């Protein structure tokens, strides 16, 4: 049964990668415009062609995987095109690439690393209403400030700093997922599985919650990249509070699962998140 599930997840990983790359082939769109098609017309035909191809090739549930991965690849490709455009939106292109890669890589790494927990939710596209509102708010702020204060969006060194924060956060989070292996899950577990072990090596030797640390700096980095002063502050406060509560919730389960072993680990290794110590234990 486990071998069959791994084989299925491997197939789903390959499917997602193939369709992500298919979506990213929108990078060839400039060739179509040079051939005489108008930009919007070419884009509309391209999107219609992709959807038709996916409908012909796949049936549910594989179509559900394919359409999501293809969409993220398409967004990534558009982000690359925007990044190289001669406009005040080029740094937004960096953001679009970072966002699409984050969501796609969450699914791909889960498929490779912990196939038993793989689902469409692994894309994290339906993370929460708060996440959606936060993303929309950052887009609105960028758009308005780009209209009224375009020079604010052309601070390249600041956007580059944000990009470095995003890359660091992404790499740390994925390192945490690979290190934890089947112990990693997007949902805090309330029951210990037979294969659940306490991971204290690799990046977990540096901090207790490296996946949260990575996501924390990734989130703030996106707003630094966009030069969004309002959302930058709001994101920092919001994600700090979120991870403070999430860390405490998770550590209650970990103490229940591993007892003294986790308490000893907790004493030795910090959370990695600024001013967050984790759940308080009364001795």
Swiss-Prot record:
Lumenal topological domain: 33-40, 87-91, 149-153, 228
Uppermost EC category: transferase
Binding site for S-adenosyl-L-methionine: 189, 196-199, 204, 209-212, 250
Protein topology in the membrane: Multi-pass membrane protein
Subcellular location: Endoplasmic reticulum membrane
Biological process per Gene Ontology, one example term: regulation of Ras protein signal transduction
Positions on the Cytoplasmic side per record topology: 1-15, 59-68, 112-130, 174-211, 244-283
Keywords: Endoplasmic reticulum, Membrane, Methyltransferase, S-adenosyl-L-methionine, Transferase, Transmembrane, Transmembrane helix
Record-level GO cellular component terms: endoplasmic reticulum; endoplasmic reticulum membrane
EC number(s) on file: 2.1.1.100
Name of the protein: Protein-S-isoprenylcysteine O-methyltransferase
Short name of one Pfam family: ICMT
Purpose: Catalyzes the post-translational methylation of isoprenylated C-terminal cysteine residues.
Top-level lineage group: Eukaryota
GO MF annotation terms: cAMP response element binding protein binding; protein C-terminal S-isoprenylcysteine carboxyl O-methyltransferase activity
Tissue expression pattern: Highly enriched in adult cerebellum, with a low level expression in other brain regions.
Family of the protein in this entry: Belongs to the class VI-like SAM-binding methyltransferase superfamily. Isoprenylcysteine carboxyl methyltransferase family.
InterPro entries in the record: ICMT_MeTrfase (IPR007269), PPMT_MeTrfase (IPR025770)
């Amino acid at each position: 049964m486990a071998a069959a599930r791994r084989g299925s997840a491997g197939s789903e990983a390959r499917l997602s990668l193939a369709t992500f790359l298919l979506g990213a082939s929108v990078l060839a769109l400039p060739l179509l415009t040079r051939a005489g098609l108008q930009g919007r017309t070419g884009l509309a035909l391209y999107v219609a062609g992709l959807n038709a191809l996916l409908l012909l090739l796949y049936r549910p549930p594989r179509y559900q995987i394919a359409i999501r991965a293809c969409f993220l690849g398409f967004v990534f490709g558009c982000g690359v095109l925007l990044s190289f455009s001669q406009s005040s939106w080029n740094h937004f292109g960096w953001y679009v690439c970072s966002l699409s890669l984050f969501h796609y890589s969450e699914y791909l790494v889960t498929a490779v690393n912990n196939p038993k927990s793989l689902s469409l939710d692994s894309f994290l596209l339906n993370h929460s209403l708060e996440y959606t509102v936060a993303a929309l708010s950052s887009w609105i702020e960028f758009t308005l400030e780009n209209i009224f204060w375009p020079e604010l969006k052309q601070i390249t060194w600041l956007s580059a700093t944000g990009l470095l924060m995003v890359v660091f956060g992404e790499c740390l989070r994925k390192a945490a997922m690979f290190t934890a292996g089947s112990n990693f899950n997007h949902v805090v577990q309330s029951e210990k599985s037979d294969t659940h072990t306490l991971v204290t090596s690799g990046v977990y030797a540096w901090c207790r919650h490296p996946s949260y640390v990575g996501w924390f700096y990734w989130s703030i980095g996106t707003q630094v990249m966009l030069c969004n002063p309002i959302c930058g502050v709001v994101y920092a406060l919001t994600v700090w509070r979120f991870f403070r509560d999430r860390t405490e919730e998770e550590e209650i389960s970990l103490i229940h699962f591993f007892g003294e072993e986790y308490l000893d680990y907790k004493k030795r290794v910090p959370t990695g998140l600024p001013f967050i110590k984790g759940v308080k234990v009364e001795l």
